[in-house]
Amino acid sequence: MVTTSSGGGIGYPANNGVTQVSLIHSSDSVRTVSTAPIYRPTSSMASTMAHKSSTAPFISANQRMSKPPVRVVAQPPPPHPQALSQQYHQQNPMMMYSAPNTRPHVIPTMQVQPTMAAQIKRNNPVNAQFQNPSEMIADYGVKPQSVEMVQRVRAVRRQVADEETELRRLRELEHETAQLQNKNYGRERELNVQGSMLKEAQLELRNASMRAQSLNKHLEEMYRRRQTAAAAALVEQRKMQQHQILLARAANQVSTQEVIRPRASVEPFQVNNTQQQQPSPQMMKSEEFSEKRDLNGQTGSYDAIDGSGDHQKIPTEPSYLAPCKENQQKYSELSKMASTDPHSNHSSPSTSSQKAPTLITFSPPSFEQKINSSTMTRDSPFVERPTSFGDSLDESRLRSGKTDLVSLRSDSLKATKRRSWAASEGTSMSEAEMIHRLLDEQRRGRSHFIPQLPTSQEEPSAITSETYAEEVVNSESKQVATSSDSTNNLELPTEQMVLGSDTTTEEDASSCSTRSDDGQNLEMEVAIERRTVKGILRRPNEKMNKGRIEFDPLALLLDAALEGELDLVRSSASKLTDVSQANDEGITALHNAICAGHYEIVRFLIENDADVNAQDSDGWTPLHCAASCNNLPMVRQLVEGGGCVLASTLSDMETPVEKCEEDEDGYDGCLKYLSAAHNSTGSINTGKVYAAYGYEAAFEDELSFDAGDELTVIEKDKVDKNWWTCEKNNGEKGQVPRTYLALYPSLKYRKKLNFVMFDLPLESNNNVE
C-alpha cells in the first residue's frame, strides 16, 4: 500500500507524495491517472480547460477498459524551482475558490513482473511523468462524484488483488497435496511389497521348523535302531573279559586254611520287593564255626556256600571269594541247576535309615554277615586280606535293580558320574563325546554304564552259591552243550526257584520264559504267583471317586529337588515318612539337589533327617556328588552333617577326596578341605568318631555298635587298611570298618551325645593317607 498526501502553500498544491498512477490494461495499454489535489476552477479557467480537453482522461480510461487494470505507481522527479514559482503566481488568484486537500489517499499496489515493468517504462517517455499544464488544469475539472467512484474502484481492486493472492496460495496448496498424495501411493505400494515378502519369510521359517522337527525324530529313530544293532558285540566283549578274569582267579587258588576278610563297604542300594520277598534260611554257627549244607531241603540257599567238612575247625571261605577244586566237584550239580535261571534277582531287604543298605539280609548268627563286611578270626595270627575290592566282591550281585539309563542333563547325578569316569579313564574326550560314547554303549544293549563291571544282561544275578571256578566250568559246559539239551524243558520245583531271600521283579518274571544265552535257548517253567485281582466295578455303598489325580510324592520330590522348587520339595516331603527314599537306582532327593547345586534344598533335607550317606546303585554318596562338582559349601555342610569322608564307591573304590575334578573351578579349596577331613578322621577331637550305621560283629575281634554311637580310634590300619581298632564308652574294643565312621555325628544324634562343634585344621599338604 502506498500512502499519498497533498499539501502546500496557499493556492498551490504541494506534491510531496505520489502524483501519477499508471493503469495497465490486460492488453498492456497504459493510462495515467493524476492524484493531484482537485481545485474548483473559476469560469475563466474552466473555459480554458474545456478548450484544451473536452473530457477527463481518467473517465475515458475507465470507459475503454473492460477488465480491471493493474496499477503501476510512477514517482515524479523533484520539481524545478522556476516552474514552482511560475505555477504559484498563476494559481494564486484561485486560492479563494479552492483549498488544499490534505487527506491522504491509500492506493493498493501489487508486484509486477520485471518484464511488464520494463515494457511500461519503454512505452512512457522520460518526461511522461510530468503532465502538461493543460492536463493538470483538466484534472481540476473532475466532478466530485468521480472521487467516490475512484474510491470504489480502488476498493474493488484491493479485493480482487486479495482474492488473486488467495487463489495463488490455494493453487500452491493443491499442487503440494497432489505431490503428497503421489508420495503416499508410492509408500503404500512399497508397504504391500514388504508385507508380501514378510509372509514368504514366515512361510519359509515355518517350513524350516517343521523340517527340523522331522529330522530330529528321524535322528532319534536312527539312534534306537543302532542301539539294537550293536548289542551283540558288546555282550560278547564283556563275556570275554569276564571269562579271562575268572580264569586268572581260578589259576591263583588260595589255600583253604587261610581266611580272607572282605573289604568293608556300605553295599549299594537295591529295590526291595516286599510282595515277592521270602525269608532267607539261617544257619547257626557251631562252636568250631563250621556249617553244614542241606541240599535236599534248601537247594540253592546260602548254606551251599560252605562245605560239609565236619573235620575242619574253621569254615571254608565263601565260595565266590576263593575257588577250590573240591568245591568244583561238590557243587557242579548245583551250579548246573542255578545256571539255568539267569533272571533271578537279589534285593536288599534292609531299608532302615539307620542301617547300611545291603544286598543280603542281616541276622546275628547267619553267614550272610560274613559276606557283607566282616572279619574272620582264626587260631592262626595271620589273616590275609584282599588288596582290591574286586577280589572280595561278587560282581554278579551288584546289578539287581532297574536300569541306570543314560541321562543327558548336565546337572544330574548321572552326568556327574560321566565326568568322573572320563577323568578316571584319563581320556581327553569332551563331555559331548563322552555322551555319544555312552549312547553308543546303550544302543548296544547295555542298560547302564559302569567301567569294568558286568551288567545284569551279561550274567545271571541269581548265582549266589557258585565259586569262580564253578563259573568257569559252567561257561565251558555251555560251549560244549548239545542241541538236544537246548530243546529239553528244564522243569524245576517251585521251592527250587526261590534261592534264599532272592526276589524276582515283575519285568524279569515276565521275560524269563525264553531267553537267549550264548546262542542257546533255555526254556523253563516258572510257578505263577497267585494274586488277588482287583475289580473295576464299584461296590455297593462305596464312596465314588471324585476323579482327583494325585502324583507320586516321591517322584515329585526327586524332580523338585533337581529343578530347585523348594516349595514343592517341602510339600512332597510332608507326604513322605522318610525324605531319604530313593528310586529304583538308589538316587535320593539329596543326590539330585547336590548335583543341581540347590543349596537351600540341601539344607532343608539335612535338617529333616535326610540320610547324608545314602548310596545309589554305584555306591555314590551325596558327598561323592558334591566333591565331584567341587562345591565346597555343600561338601562342608555334608561333612558337618555326618557324612562319611572315608566312604568308597563300588565301581572304582574311590573316596570323596579322590572325586574332586582338577579341571573344574574350586578344585583347590575342595581338595584342601576334604584332605583335612580325611586325615583328621580318628586323629582330631581326641580320636573320637561317630557311627553312621549300626553294625553287628560277625567275628570275635570285631566290635558291635549302633548308629550314632561315639567311638574312640585307638589304632589305624594295623590289621587291615579298611579296619580300625576302636573303643566304645563302656570299654569294649574291637575292629570296626572305617567306612561306617564319620567325623561329625548326624543332627538327630547330637542332643543325645552333647556334641560340641569344632573346626578342621586346614593343612597345606593334600596327600591322603
Swiss-Prot record:
Inactivation phenotype: RNAi-mediated knockdown results in an increase in number of apoptotic germ cells. Double RNAi-mediated knockdown together with cep-1 abrogates this increased number of apoptotic germ cells.
What keyword terms does UniProt attach to this protein? Answer: ANK repeat, Apoptosis, Nucleus, Proto-oncogene, Repeat, SH3 domain
GO BP: apoptotic process; negative regulation of apoptotic process
Give the source species.
Caenorhabditis elegans
Per its UniProt record, what Pfam families does this chain match?
Ank_2, SH3_1
Q: What is this protein called?
A: Apoptotic enhancer 1 protein
Where does the record say this protein resides? Answer: Nucleus
Q: What is its main location?
A: nucleus
- Taxon lineage: Eukaryota, Metazoa, Ecdysozoa, Nematoda, Chromadorea
The region annotated as signal peptide is none
Where composition is biased (Polar residues), the residues are 354-378, 453-467, 474-491
Task: Name the gene that codes for it.
Answer: ape-1
